[in-house]
Amino acid sequence: MARKPLIAGNWKMNLNHLEAIALVQKIAFSLPAKYFDKVDVTVIPPFTDIRSVQTLVEGDKLLLTYGAQDVSAHDSGAYTGEISGSMLAKLGCTFVVVGHSERRTLHCEDNDTVLAKTKAALKNGITPIVCIGEGLDVREAGEHVSYNVEQLRGSLAGLSGEDIAKVVIAYEPVWAIGTGRVASAANAQEVCAAIRATLGELASQDVASGVRVLYGGSVNAKNVGEIVGQTDVDGALVGGASLKADEFATLSAIAAGGPLP
């Protein structure tokens, strides 16, 4: 099954709403409509920017989409500081990142929490980008494949094949995030192939063949082509490079198969 590449730009805690508007405008200007037949492009801004991005995307009928960096496991209630899936859906979010390594590490989110957030996203018609990945100690011990498979199983435990078909998986080796280090294309393929095989076990081969698996970890215009060219890598979850309109547009164009913008 042909899988359309996805390039997702995770802005993390950067840019105010005015800066967000300027960046989205620059990205859209750099990517003519022809590219969107071959690649899906989404931006993942902070919560405070989403309404401004929504107004711009809908008002100018832009072809790129947008999403959120996190979602509450709860529908509503006394959960100070949390944002529900229904709120994000009302803002038109297509995607939401769940289980990012920074959430798992800094906010102590475990697989059960990631699973609950994944369910919350699906309940509200939002595509969860479920993140998994190993630290350097696991990689050096040669246990990276089994570690990621276990994390994947825990993060999707009990989901139906129908629900699994609606998720995106992002493999983000923690040791390569924001460090400038990057897994080789072969490294990325090894883990992404194991992810797809596990999806086949959790759901079916048909479902697994349709799920997009992204690579995230110091992705840039120089390495994205080789990485997304791997059989089981269907795009990238981009960090720092997504804050630079020209580079993010170039990444997207490369994933689309060119030509460069």
UniProtKB/Swiss-Prot annotation:
Alphabetized InterPro entries for the sequence: Aldolase_TIM, TIM_sf, TrioseP_Isoase_bac/euk, Triosephosphate_isomerase, Triosephosphate_isomerase_AS
Keyword Cytoplasm set for record: yes
EC number(s) per entry: 5.3.1.1
Main location: cytoplasm
Source taxon at top rank: Bacteria
Pfam families: TIM
Catalytic activity line of the entry: D-glyceraldehyde 3-phosphate = dihydroxyacetone phosphate
Positions annotated as active site in the UniProt record: H100 (electrophile), E172 (proton acceptor)
Subcellular location: Cytoplasm
CDD domains in UniProt: TIM (cd00311)
One term of GO molecular function: triose-phosphate isomerase activity
GO biological process, one term: glycerol catabolic process
Keywords tagged on the record: Cytoplasm, Gluconeogenesis, Glycolysis, Isomerase
GO CC annotation: cytosol
Pathway where it operates: Carbohydrate biosynthesis; gluconeogenesis; Carbohydrate degradation; glycolysis; D-glyceraldehyde 3-phosphate from glycerone phosphate: step 1/1
Residues reported to bind substrate: N10, W11, K12, G178, S218, G239, G240
Record function comment: Involved in the gluconeogenesis. Catalyzes stereospecifically the conversion of dihydroxyacetone phosphate (DHAP) to D-glyceraldehyde-3-phosphate (G3P).
Quaternary structure and partners: Homodimer.
Entry's family note: Belongs to the triosephosphate isomerase family.
Name of this protein: Triosephosphate isomerase
